[in-house]
Every structure is written in C-alpha cells, then in structure tokens.
Amino acid sequence: KTGEVISERTVGTYMRQMGIRAQWSKPWTITTKDSDFSTELQNILDEQFNPDRPNAVWCSDITYIWTIDGFVYLTSIMDLFSRKIIAWTLSETLEVSCVIDTINKAKARRNIDQPLIIHSDRGSQYVAKEYKKATENMQRSYSKKAFPWDNACIESFHSVIKREWLNRFKIRDYKQAYQLIFEYLEAFYNTKRIHSHCNYMSPNEFERVYERTHTEAELLAG
C-alpha cells in the first residue's frame, strides 16, 4: 500500500525469520450442483467483473464449513464494484430459504435505484421459484454448466476466508463458526483488508471514495 515492491522469495525469507507459516487452501468441494441446464438461463454477466458503480452487479454463492458437529453452510452476496460482502447467512442446511434470507438482507441494506444484475451458479437454490420471486426486479445471470470461473470473484472470496482465517481453527459448532465469520467480515474483510481491485483500499473505503467523488461531480454539474 505504501508502494514498496519486494519479491515473493524475500517475503518467504521474512516469514521464516518471523516464524510465520503460509496458509494453504484445502481441496475444493462442491456444495451446489448444477440442477438446471436450460439454455434459458443466460450468462448475462459474461465474466465482466468490474462494474463502474455500486449495485450494478451482485454475485452469490454457497460454501461449506467443517465443524466438529457437522458441516454448516455460508451463503454470501458480493457487490462486484467494491468486492464488499453486502450480506451473508450461516445455516445448518442447504435449503433455498438461506439464499432468500441473504437476498432480503442485501436488499434492505443497499439502495437499488438502477438496473441490477445478480449472478450465481445453476444450483437448485438459485433456480427455485422462491429465488426467482425474491429477485423479480433484478436481471438474473447464471454461470455456464460446470464452469465455476464464471463466478470467480465470490468463489475466490470463499477460498480466502477459509485460507486466511477459518482453517486456523478447529471449529466446534455453528455458534463458533458464526462468531469467526462475523469477526472476519465485519471487523476485517469489509473494513480493513486491502484489495488490489480497490486500488489497495478496503471495500468500505473504496465505496466511500466513490460516493464522495460522485457527490462532488454532481455538485459541480449543478
């Protein structure tokens, strides 16, 4: 962030000297299987991951989290403009209601005053009639069959939260998993973690800069 450039080898040397171990991603596991191969489900987003304003494109996905008591499932919605996680829900099942709850949280928190695309895979939760009703005023976009790269940003986030945080713990149960996710998202990822996409600002800071610049431009325009 301060403009210092060093090689990966130098970073590795410093990490060894400081006793810091790298965090590795565990093998990817499928949580939602494509359930609708209809050609009616179009990939409107088409890997255009850099919208020019907030609330232009949201993307959503579900990932599993291992606990001693059994798996729990994290549903997240990301605003692609800032890579901010604008809503999330942790559940003990993969029912469609978990996705709907997350969408309702996002709609309550964000000001949707222009066309909005919401992108997901073709899992059963995202093609259900309840999902279509919850997103009836949005443009629904779907990844191609068995092609997770079409939803790369949210897939990457779920990998990051596990690699950087959750994999450090032997999580006991739902309650501990919820606490850990809350701490990471609300006290770090959205507020402090810098992102190259955001010009090395946090998602919250990136959105604040946009709002300030946008407001100033409107004032100058009269």
Regions of interest found by a model, annotated:
Residues A22, Q139-R140:
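Hydrophobic beta-strand scaffold residues
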Residues E47, P51-I86, E92-T93:
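An active-site-proximal beta-strand-loop segment
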Residues T31-S35, S120-R122, A128-E130, Y142-K162, ...:
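RNase H-like two-metal-ion nuclease catalytic core shared by retroviral integrases
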Residues V11, M15, L45, D61, ...:
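Mobile genetic element proteins and their domesticated derivatives, centered on retroelements
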Residues T2-G3, F49-N50, T67-I68, R122, ...:
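Conserved, non-catalytic sequence blocks in retroelement Pol enzymes and Pol-derived host proteins
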Residues K1-R53, F147, S202-E211:
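Basic, flexible linker segments flanking DNA-binding modules
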Residues W66, G70, W88-I112, V127:
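Active-site beta-loop-alpha junctions of metal-dependent nucleic acid enzymes
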Residues E136, V160-G222:
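C-terminal domain-tail junction helix/linker
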